Amino acid sequence: MIPIIILTPKVIVSINGNDPAFRIATDDCIAICMRTAMYAFLLNLILKIENKKVRNVIISVVVLSQILIQGLAYIGVPEEKRGGPEHSDSSIEVANELLSTFNTNNTELYRYKDINQNLTENYPLVMDCPSISTFLHIVSKEQVLTHSQLGYTRNNTKLGDCGGTLLSDAILGIKYTLSSDEMDNKIYQKDGTSESGINLYEYKNMLPYGIIYENTEDIRTIPEEYNVYETQNYVYKNLFSKNEDMIQEITTQKQKIDNNGDLTKYKYTIRVNEKSYLYMHGNESNSKIYIMRVNGENVTIPWINNQDNTEYPYRYENGIINLGKFENQDVEIEVVCYKEDCNLKFATLPLEKFENFISNYKENTAKEINIENNKIKIKIENAKAGQKLFLPITYDTGWTGVNNGEVQDINRIFNTYISLDLKEGTNEIELTFIPAKMKLGIELSIATLVIILVYTFGIKKLIKKDGILDKIIVNLGFGIYIIITVGFYFKVYLMCIIQTIKQWIGLIE
């Protein structure tokens, strides 16, 4: 009750753009302190009322009034004052429109990608479609780190699906792209445009969902020291038994051309021979770009609250950036950065080589994959001994499986994906996902409920109230509760603070 009363923002009589409910400035802090003293005095008077029923009614009215006023305070606040589209319902309206226009809920396997970040990371939940994007925060450390290592944008544990390359999209089953810009018609096929001006594209050529591969090396993890391009080539070469890199990293030197206080201007000159996409990537720890120009043209790096953003890397946009398609030319890239924080890495993806790879890829097996609720059903015929199936689905100990009626081992690959060993001939596989600790949680909850019922309706009636035995049982139960509660808060909250401080110390050292 007291936290609800004390921590609520001040009552707003008139809602307007200059005084939004979300702002807690100095005057608000003073108002909270004054109101806290007032409520403390008021509660002291209320608690002196001897009539328990009257006392409880008055306290309830006070608390509910504050909750009601708090709710009303958020009505009418302009979108730009409450976090922009990212934290308002406008992005949900756009996602609903896309769902209605493109029937995204009919897509079972292949994933979607919001390349301009017109939506929040949770758009797949609204559009009922597959995607690597998520705002749920319930993701593993391996999933978060691999997401970044492959060059997709990430804001702490919010995973976005913009970034990456044509290669990583193909491997991860990202077939459909939502974009407010026109896409390369040599690579993409346009499927339609929504009323909000967002286009739906799909790759003209695509790898099958799930890759049959042969590899006896230990590829459960990806070397931590690999950059985004090395990571993509590592995955590509190990899945498809290739010796050459698909993505060609470029070694180039930056040239300082201007220095004005905290702002420094650099120029990169990159020679691109065969027709290629030119990619760029930078880390937030050593790069802070304010403006970027490619052959004199400004580069925008959009995100949901600012489609004209030019900062990079930004906490909302820090994945691989596609700078465009070039052939037989020198590409000049000018950047204006903070002081000298400019450590960008460039690479090219030769389009003819990539398209030939996709077009010529063949699997000598018949494969069917169906996903429904928490089950994945897979049928593979004509498999050879030693072959494996790569699934671009997050590995978790909660997965169990059977293959032809026998237990199927589920292996981790590339830090966070699933690999299945296949049997020679026909494989009829069914995978089922149940959160790893869910059964234990249910069992503990039932056991706790049984103990409470036995104590309340059994033991408590047989022992003396407030007697020694009663006090021992109550204090023991309360002690266990405190230990569990403190442990929970330590694990969820305090450990995060400790880890953050350790990271700060590491950066200082």
Predicted regions and their residues:
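Short, polar loop motifs at secondary-structure junctions
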Residues: 117-119, 178-184, 394-397
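Extracytoplasmic/lumenal acceptor-recognition loop(s) of multi-pass membrane glycoenzymes
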Residues: 63-86, 100-170, 207, 212-232, ...
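C-terminal, active-site-flanking charged/polar segments
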Residues: 1-3, 20-21, 25, 40, ...
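A cross-kingdom signal targeting lumenal/periplasmic-facing segments of multi-pass membrane
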Residues: 130-261, 267-271, 277-281, 285, ...
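Beta-sheet entry/capping signal
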Residues: 56-62, 109-112, 175-176, 198-200, ...
